[in-house]
Swiss-Prot record:
Protein's name according to its UniProt entry: Serine protease SSP1
UniProt family annotation: Belongs to the peptidase S1 family.
Catalytic residues (UniProt): 80 (charge relay system), 131 (charge relay system), 223 (charge relay system)
Biological classification of the source: Eukaryota, Metazoa, Ecdysozoa, Arthropoda, Myriapoda
Main location: secreted
Enzyme Commission number(s) of this protein: 3.4.21.-
Cleaved propeptide residues: 19-35
Localization (cell): Secreted
Alphabetical UniProt keywords: Disulfide bond, Hydrolase, Protease, Secreted, Serine protease, Signal
One Gene Ontology MF term: serine-type endopeptidase activity
Position of the signal peptide: 1-18
All residue ranges annotated as the Peptidase S1 domain in the record: 36-273
Statement: the UniProt record of this protein carries the keyword Transferase: no
Amino acid sequence: GTRKTGILLLFLVAATTSFKLPKNESPVLISDDDRIIGGTQAYPNAYPFMVRLTTIWQNGWGGSCGRSLIXSQWVLTAAHCVYNLEKSMYWERVIVYLGDHYSQVTDAHEQVKEAADVIVHENYISSGSNDVALIKLKTPANINSYVKPGCLNSKSNDFIGQDATAAGWGLTSTIGNTISNVLMEATLPIVAPKNCPIINPPTMICTGFKREVGQDTVFKGDSGGPLFLSKNGFTILGVASFVTLDNSYPQKVTSAVFTKVSAHLSWIQENTKATDLWCAKNNHHS
């Protein structure tokens, strides 16, 4: 991977720039301050691997993204959350909130950590593909029932036809700036790649919607957050990357795309060298 310690060059170029879009659809990165649309409020601490991140940029602007704790000292997120070559913006500080539910207050079981290192996938830097990154915490998390790593999916199964969950803090509508200060969740069906106009099936997962009206999906601020299954523990399938919007109805999200975890396991292992990854012995999904 490409590693920068201390100051990291940040990059917000869409992972979709090399694809040709249908005329009626446009890609939108689920970037800083982009959130769950619709959905329901999650039960407090229901997802102990969920991480909220705040970045403080060189110009004083702050951003927010979702992340997943995958080992006691490692967090998984989207590359576009932490790397912006186009704007030549640097983060001065990254703050990671573990065991968080209410973003506006300090929760009883919340742990606050700072980033010691960030690793961005080298293909993202060169071509905008492989929208995935790792953050190493300065000190390991205190693992308990409120803060616990999720398992990384190691199965080749694409889970098409199954329902998965996405979670994040934020925008509850494509209209205006109504932001939720609590963790929200949405159920998203995993659909065949042909349903996503911009997708590289070996490295991406396509999701659709459970209902036609008031569609639940991910949007701005949910970037980097997980797509996961909750049976027999939590298995992380993907990392929120981008959505496509209908050009005729700009408030309508047509699909949401996640970076596929199983396609990046060797990269994650190589760069973290963590011994407590994957939960392979406890991964019951097939």
